[in-house]
């Protein structure tokens, strides 16, 4: 049994990611991170996960998820399961900052993914989308 200690906040543009549990903490069963999204922030392009599922639990604000062309709006306390292979994206159209927990099962997505994307996105100027796509591919994501 492990108690996770507070970890770094990884900033990808305006979005903040903070891992609470990594796959190494759970024998690979899951990874868990908190995501903070200000209103009208640039968000990830539509994508799908090749090797894992994602479950979202809304903590604060209202976040809209587009999953396989269907628009779903989550309020605090609501959850959403995104199956492996489902094309999805999220956006904060509201006036308050959104916070949600994302659980990755199995726990194969590490903070390294977000660190690598942050290095490209936060470099200044338009992000190198080809480079972001390469990073995504190495970590089990496909742009849609």
Where are these regions (language model features)?
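Short acidic-glycine-tyrosine-enriched beta hairpin
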Residues: 2-3, 8-10, 69-87
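A short glycine-rich, His/Asp/Glu-containing loop-to-beta-strand
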Residues: 10-46, 52-53
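Structural motif
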Residues: 16, 55, 62-64, 71, ...
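Residue-level recognition of conserved beta-strand positions in structured domain cores
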Residues: 34, 67-69, 76, 84, ...
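Short, conserved beta-strand element in jelly-roll/cupin
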Residues: 34-38, 48-66, 103
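Short beta-strand segments
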Residues: 44-46, 67-72
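Ligand-binding loop in jelly-roll beta-barrel domains
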Residues: 84-111
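Acidic/histidine-enriched, glycine/proline-rich intrinsically disordered or flexible terminal extensions
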Residues: 113-144
């Amino acid at each position: 049994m492990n108690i996770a200690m507070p970890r770094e906040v990884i900033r990808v543009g305006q979005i903040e990611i903070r891992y609470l549990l990594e796959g190494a903490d759970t024998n690979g069963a899951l990874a868990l991170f908190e995501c903070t999204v200000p209103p009208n922030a640039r968000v990830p392009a539509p994508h799908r996960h090749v090797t894992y599922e994602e479950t979202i639990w809304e903590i604060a604000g209202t976040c809209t998820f587009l999953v396989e062309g269907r628009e779903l709006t989550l309020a605090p306390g609501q959850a959403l399961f995104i199956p492996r292979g489902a094309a999805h994206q999220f956006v904060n159209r509201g006036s308050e900052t959104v916070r949600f927990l994302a659980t990755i099962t199995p726990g194969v997505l590490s903070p390294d993914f977000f660190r690598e994307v942050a290095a490209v996105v936060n470099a200044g100027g338009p992000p190198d989308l080809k480079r972001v796509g390469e990073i995504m591919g190495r970590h089990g994501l496909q742009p849609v």
